[in-house]
């Protein structure tokens, strides 16, 4: 009787232990093949955050109104960096648009009100081959006959000036590095002022058109 009792007990214990092992193995397999079920946290994939395109802009406060320029740092990185450097240093403050031609462009950034040239930094490489065109409302670097001679002076086109665009290395063009996004009507007004010859330079406004300040700002 005793031996049968222990035999039955051992059988019951064996069955219980086997059942527990099966259950444990089942749990482990479920957790290993479905790691996200336990907490639910890993099942939620994070959406990639949208990268905001921040454009650098410069506001020219002039004696005839404000002009806001959006800079194309992607197409003209060297030129934009150069322009921002001058603006942040206050170089353009109290300079003038010293060359104004109606139906063509306005040029400034290098002379004081009394027509004295400011000493610039070293010249930069010409980025005119960047695909940007000298269309109405664009800003580009002025230079001498040497393509890589641009320093501080710039011009804003009042009309499409295709003849200023890059064609090939032998016709290198003028480097566009931004466009007017506000105040093009101010540019148009500036082109209507009376001009004269001063200090050997033609097309100088009789009444100075002053760049009071050039401030770097950013917009989305």
Sequence positions of predicted segments:
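Cyclophilin-like peptidyl-prolyl cis-trans isomerases
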Residues: 2-220
């Amino acid at each position: 009787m005793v031996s049968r009792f222990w035999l039955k007990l051992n059988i019951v214990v064996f069955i219980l232990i086997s059942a527990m092992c099966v259950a444990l193995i089942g749990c482990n397999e479920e957790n290993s093949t479905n790691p996200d079920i336990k907490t639910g946290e890993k099942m939620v994939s994070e959406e990639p955050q949208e990268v905001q395109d921040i454009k650098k802009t410069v506001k020219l406060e002039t004696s005839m109104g404000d002009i806001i320029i959006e800079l194309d740092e992607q197409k003209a990185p060297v030129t934009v960096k150069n322009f921002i450097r001058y603006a942040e240093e206050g170089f353009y403050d109290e300079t003038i648009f010293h060359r104004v031609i109606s139906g063509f462009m306005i040029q400034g950034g290098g002379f004081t009100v009394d027509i004295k040239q400011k000493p610039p930094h070293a010249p930069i490489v010409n980025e005119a081959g960047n695909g940007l065109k000298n269309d109405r409302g664009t800003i580009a670097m002025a230079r001498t006959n040497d393509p890589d001679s641009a320093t501080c002076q710039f011009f804003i086109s009042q009309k499409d000036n295709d003849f200023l665009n890059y064609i090939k290395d032998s016709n290198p063009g003028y480097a566009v590095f931004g466009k007017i996004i506000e105040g093009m009507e101010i540019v148009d007004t500036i082109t209507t002022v009376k001009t004269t010859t001063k200090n050997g330079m033609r097309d100088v406004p009789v009444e100075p058109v002053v760049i009071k300040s050039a401030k770097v700002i950013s917009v989305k």
